[in-house]
Amino acid sequence: MKLESEIAQRKFQNERHKITVNIIYTYGWLNTLHSAIFKDHGITTQQYNVLRILRGQSPNPTTIKLIRERMLDKMSDASRIVEKLRQKGLAARHISEHDKRHVDVFITKKGLKVLQALDKRQKEFENHSAKLSLKEVQQLNLLLDKMRG
């Protein structure tokens, strides 16, 4: 469906303004769809992102600093998210005896199981781009990379 219909706006200042609004709108649309899937597993989008980072580092621990650097949403509070995951038993942490500021974080078996269940639902994530051909998906990826570049 066209953006103009979705947000009931007939005109934009120009095409660059329209793409900005379109990207923000599309982010919200995808986030809503993905949040529903994550909610089924008792986690948020940000918690999912952190779990994926932890799994990528596994079996080695990682630090809050590295998590923060790799997060998709740079404005998220990585320490708070890790604490929520710890409370749910999806992540664990180890505070250094020598330096109390150094905290190692790692994913638990329960956290891995949640990600495995979400991996099985990967097709649901991919269905959101099913209206695009593979060539269009590749082109969109290139254009988005170029825009940020």
What are these language model-derived features?
Residues 1-12, 135-149:
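C-terminal regulatory/oligomerization modules of transcriptional regulators
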Residues 24, 52-59, 119, 145:
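Short, locally clustered residues in the helix-turn-helix/winged-helix DNA-binding domain
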Residues 22, 49-53, 113, 139:
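Pre-recognition alpha-helix immediately N-terminal to the DNA-recognition helix
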Residues 83-139:
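Charged, amphipathic alpha-helical coiled-coil/dimerization segments
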Residues 1-41:
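N-terminal leader segment of winged-helix/HTH proteins
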